[in-house]
Each structure stands twice: as C-alpha cells, then as structure tokens.
C-alpha cells in the first residue's frame, strides 16, 4: 500500500486564490518585458526586408543595373579612403624632425593670431587696474594726511609680535614735523599673543623714545556692550586669552591725564594710524564698547577717515591702513598681513620662508602630519589633511600654502621678536627733554610700576612660541615725482613694479571726459568684469561713430574746391557739372 501511494501523482488542482495570483504575476511580468523592449529595442535583430521590383515594371533591368553600379561606386570609395589613410599613416611614420618643427611653428602662428585680441584685452585690463590702484594709493595718503592735520594726539598701532617690523619712523617724523604741538603714543596691540616677559622688554625699549602702552582689542561679535577688563584683573593666562578687551582703562586714563595736564577744557582729537589689519578699528570699537567702525580679517576694510566720539573730552579718528615699503618685494607685506593672501600669485616662496623659521617637528605637531623631507611634500600632506583635492585626487598644494600664510597672520603660528640690545650711553634720535615732557603730560610714571608688577606675575609657556628676527622698521619708498608729495607714502594696496601706471593724464574737455561708475572702483564689487565689458562696448561704438563722421568730412573736403574747375566755372551747367555717383 505504501508503494502504491508513492507512485500516485500529485494533483494539479489549485485553489482559486493561488491560481489568480499566479496569473496576475505572469501578466505583470509580460507587461514589464514589453515595456523594457519598447525602451531598448534590439538593433539588427530583424533582417532588412529586401526591396523587390515587380516583374511588370518595364524598366526592371535598368533599375537593377543602376543599383549594382551604385554599390560598386560605394565600395570603390571605401577602398580609396582606406588606401589614403594607409598612405598618410606610412608618411607620418617616417616624419623628420624638421617637418615637426615647421608644423609646430605653423600651429603656434595660428594660435597667436587667434588669441591676439585676448592678449590686448588683458594688457588693457592690467593698465586700468594699475591706474585704479594708483588713484587709491593717493586717496589713502590724503586721508592719512588729514588725520595727522586734524589730530592732537596720534596713536600709532603696532603688532606686539613684531613691533619694529610693523612700525615706521616716517609716521613719527610726520607727527613731529606737523604744525601744532602734536603728541605720539605707541600702542602694542595683540598683547595676548606674546609672552609677558617679551612684552615687558618691548615696553621698556620703547619708553626710551616716548609714551607706550600694551593693549588687547576685543574680539567679541555683538554690536554693543563689548567686554572690558582692567589691568589689575589680568593675573592669569586664561584672562589674557579671552575675547574681552584689556588695556582700555589705562589708555583712556593716559588721554584723560593729557587733557588735564595741558589744561584743555574743550575736547581733543585722537588719530589712530598704522599698517593695514594691525587692529586700528578694533581698538576704537573696544574703547567705545560698540561697533563704531567696520572691522575684518583682510586688509583694506577702512576706506576713508572716520570720526567717532568717545566722550565729551575725546574724539577718535580712524585712518585707512598705510604701508611704507622700500622695494617691489611684497613678501614682508604679506607676512605682516598688509596685503591680502588671496592676491599673492606665488604663495609657495613666502610659505617656505615661514617653514624655514622653525623646526620640522614644530609644524608636524601643529598640523598633525608625519615627517617630511621637502616643502612640496609638506604642502601635499597638509592639503590631504585639510581635505583639499583637485581633479583625479591631486592634493591642492596652493590652498595648503595659502593656509600656512593665513595661520601666520591670524596667530595660529605663534611667534615673537626680541628688542634690540641697547648699550649704555647709546643716543636716541629724540632728545631726553622731549621724552620727559611727554611722559609728564600723559603721567606715564604712575602706570609704569603697575604694568611691570602685573606683567611679572603673569607667566606664560613659551614652548610653542618661536622667536624670529625682526625685519626692522619700514622705510619710505623713493618718490616717483618730486613735485608730488602724495607719492612718498603708499597705501594698503601695493602695486607690482612690472605694471607701470600712467604718469599723467591729458586734459580733456568736460564733454569728452569718460564718466566711470564709482561702484566699479570698489574691490568688493562682484560684477566688475561685466561693467568693464559694458564700458568697452560703449567705447567701441563711440569710436565707430567718430570714424564715420571723420570719413564724411574727408569726402566733403576732397570734393570741395575753392578754384574754378574749368573754363566754364562762371556758368553752371546742370547736365555737365552734376554727376550722380
């Protein structure tokens, strides 16, 4: 019985639910296949249907003969193209060096002809940029001269990390030589970035030539009620590393003592000058405890002189940044943050000079990278660490070099300089009587002991701070034109020596002067290229109109004559003299 049951076949009867379910799946599958076949039809799967000529056609033989001849022509053309391709390939295989040179010269000539207009446009653009920069430099110097003329006290702001490198003796000469009894006070800003002992040494060094004070501007982002601390509260390193302002009370007390000792009953104007991005506007905001002036991490934010009222006795004047340079090399200006890092064409040379100032272990620890043998290897590893890659995974070494310069300017790479050694009996360029009188006016002696006592209590680790050699005070550039005093001092934009601007402009009538949109001269304008192209287009149209007018005038002059053209000049004959062109 068991074997009989095993041999019996399983019934094919299905439930209605399962049967309809299977049928539905089959329908869906077939529908999906048809849809896919419509989207991707198989090419060449079906044979092309032969075009047959019916026998009743009277010219069947002639038509077939023409078709056969057409096929033969196509085949002959295909074979001819094949033979020509083979011959060309054989000819190129044995190509000589002279023919390759001739081919290269021909292609370079064609390329030069095609891109000749582009080179002219680039030269014109460089010329316009140079002229614009020259105008900006003169405008910035005029603003600096206004600040010196209107101010009673001038605050020269320098970087505490390199005070000599960010100071210029020409500012002091301008203040001493200006009409009126003007005073100069040196402010060591960014005092939180250097060790206390180093800061104290710099204060003692500059006290020999005039009043000086340390300062740390506020880095808070709110619009008003900026934080401020007194020097007596600056007892720990943590207090110095905060975002609040330190040293404002001392500076305001010095200015108040100056007003009181000089018997000034009205108010004084205090000008704030220095190189770009040294913290002039930040100092004014810290003193006023508000956003009185625009500030930014890039140089050139302040464009013109701004006057801010601190209180009833003191008015502050903000000045655009000025740069005194003696040559065309801009590496020092970049490392002092006086020039934008994004404008540097070759950041590798300047970044390599930064890497040479410290050991490899210092930068490997700072950027968390492995040891390197060459500077190129360092930039590649740093770019990979930053996640900066170009196409095909190539490290962006340019971005890495610019990042090193930004770290140098923002204080991530900590450094300081030592004041020069002063020998006994060494003379100062300012007489001792002037120094003592200025110290009495500002009452510096009362604050000197307090500063020294506080700075001695503040000990800071100097392991991660490297000592570098200062580049020395900035010198004035040789003037281009002796009659023009504005060329003696250049502003925050440094012109490349290769791009020589125009020495002068020809006088033009007011009707013929080109009116330039002042918005195009702004550095922040994003539609600069569009505006320049539009101006060039208008200029071309005007030139075409002028040429047409000139050609019409010349035609009239050629056809016009004062003398008689013939013996019949006395009587005009319409048929003979009138000529239709």
UniProtKB/Swiss-Prot annotation:
Q: Chief location of this protein?
A: nucleus
Query: What happens when the protein's gene is inactivated?
Result: Impaired embryonic development resulting in a profoundly reduced rate of larval hatching.
Indicate, by first and last residue, each region the UniProt record lists as having compositional bias (Basic and acidic residues). 500-517
* Positions bearing Phosphoserine: 99
For the CP-type G domain, which residue ranges apply? 141-325
Q: What InterPro entries is this protein classified in? A: G_CP_dom, Gnl3_N_dom, GTP-bd, GTP-bd_ortho_bundle_sf, P-loop_NTPase, TRAFAC_YlqF/YawG_RiboMat
Arranged from A to Z, the UniProt key words for this protein are:
Coiled coil, GTP-binding, Nucleotide-binding, Nucleus, Phosphoprotein
Q: Which Gene3D superfamilies match?
A: 1.10.1580.10, P-loop containing nucleotide triphosphate hydrolases
Record comment regarding domains: In contrast to other GTP-binding proteins, this family is characterized by a circular permutation of the GTPase motifs described by a G4-G1-G3 pattern.
The protein's name is Guanine nucleotide-binding protein-like 3 homolog
Organism name: Drosophila melanogaster
Q: What is the lineage of its organism?
A: Eukaryota, Metazoa, Ecdysozoa, Arthropoda, Hexapoda
Q: Which gene encodes it?
A: Ns1
């Amino acid at each position: 019985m068991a074997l009989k049951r095993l041999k019996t076949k399983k019934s094919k009867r299905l439930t209605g639910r399962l049967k309809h379910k299977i049928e539905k799946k089959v329908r869906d599958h077939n529908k999906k296949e048809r849809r896919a076949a419509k989207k991707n039809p198989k090419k060449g799967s079906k044979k092309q249907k032969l075009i047959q000529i019916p026998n009743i056609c009277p010219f069947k033989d002639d038509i077939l003969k023409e078709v056969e001849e057409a096929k033969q022509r196509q085949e002959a053309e295909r074979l001819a193209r094949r033979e020509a391709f083979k011959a060309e390939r054989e000819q190129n295989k044995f190509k000589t060096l002279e023919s390759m040179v001739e081919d290269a010269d021909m292609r370079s000539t064609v390329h030069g002809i095609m891109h000749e207009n582009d080179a002219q446009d680039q030269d014109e653009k460089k010329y316009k940029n140079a002229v614009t920069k020259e105008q900006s430099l003169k405008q910035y110097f005029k603003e600096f001269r206004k600040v010196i003329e209107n101010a009673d006290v001038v605050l020269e702001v320098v970087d505490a990390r390199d005070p000599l490198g960010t100071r210029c003796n020409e500012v002091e000469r301008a203040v001493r030589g200006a009409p009126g009894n003007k005073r100069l006070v040196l402010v060591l800003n960014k005092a939180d970035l250097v060790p206390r002992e180093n800061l104290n040494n710099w204060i003692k060094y500059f006290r020999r030539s005039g009043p000086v004070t340390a300062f740390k501007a506020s880095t808070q982002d709110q619009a008003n009620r900026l934080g401020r601390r007194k020097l007596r509260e600056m007892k720990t390193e943590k207090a110095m590393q905060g975002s609040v302002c330190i040293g404002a009370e001392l500076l305001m007390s010095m200015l108040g003592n100056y007003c009181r000792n000089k018997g000034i009953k009205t108010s004084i104007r205090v000008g704030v000058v220095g190189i770009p991005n040294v913290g002039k506007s930040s100092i004014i905001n810290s003193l006023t405890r508000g956003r009185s002036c625009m500030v930014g991490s890039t140089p050139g934010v302040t464009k013109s002189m701004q006057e801010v009222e601190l209180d009833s006795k003191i008015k502050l004047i903000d000045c655009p940044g000025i740069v005194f340079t003696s040559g065309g090399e801009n590496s020092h200006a970049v490392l002092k943050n006086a020039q934008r890092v994004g404008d540097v064409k070759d950041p590798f040379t300047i970044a390599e000079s930064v890497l040479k100032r410290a050991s490899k272990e210092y930068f490997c620890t700072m950027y968390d990278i492995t040891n390197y043998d060459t500077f190129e290897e360092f930039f590649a590893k740093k770019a990979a660490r930053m996640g900066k890659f170009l196409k095909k995974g190539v490290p962006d070494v340019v971005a890495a070099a610019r990042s090193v310069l930004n770290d140098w300017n923002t204080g991530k790479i900590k450094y300081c300089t030592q004041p020069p050694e002063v020998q006994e009996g060494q003379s100062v360029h300012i007489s001792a009587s002037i120094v003592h009188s200025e110290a009495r006016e500002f009452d510096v002696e009362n604050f000197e002991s307090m500063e020294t006592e506080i700075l001695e209590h503040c000990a800071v680790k100097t392991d991660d701070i490297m000592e570098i050699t200062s580049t020395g005070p900035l010198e004035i550039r040789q003037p281009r034109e002796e009659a023009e005093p504005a060329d003696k001092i250049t502003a925050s934009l440094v012109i490349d020596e290769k791009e020589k601007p125009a020495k002068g402009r020809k006088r033009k009538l007011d009707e013929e002067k080109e009116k330039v949109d002042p918005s195009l001269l702004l550095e922040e304008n994003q539609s600069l290229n569009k505006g320049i192209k539009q101006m060039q287009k208008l200029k071309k149209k005007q030139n075409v109109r002028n040429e047409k007018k000139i050609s019409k005038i010349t035609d009239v002059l050629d056809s016009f004559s004062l003398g008689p053209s013939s013996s019949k000049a006395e009587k005009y004959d319409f048929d003979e003299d009138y000529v239709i062109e």
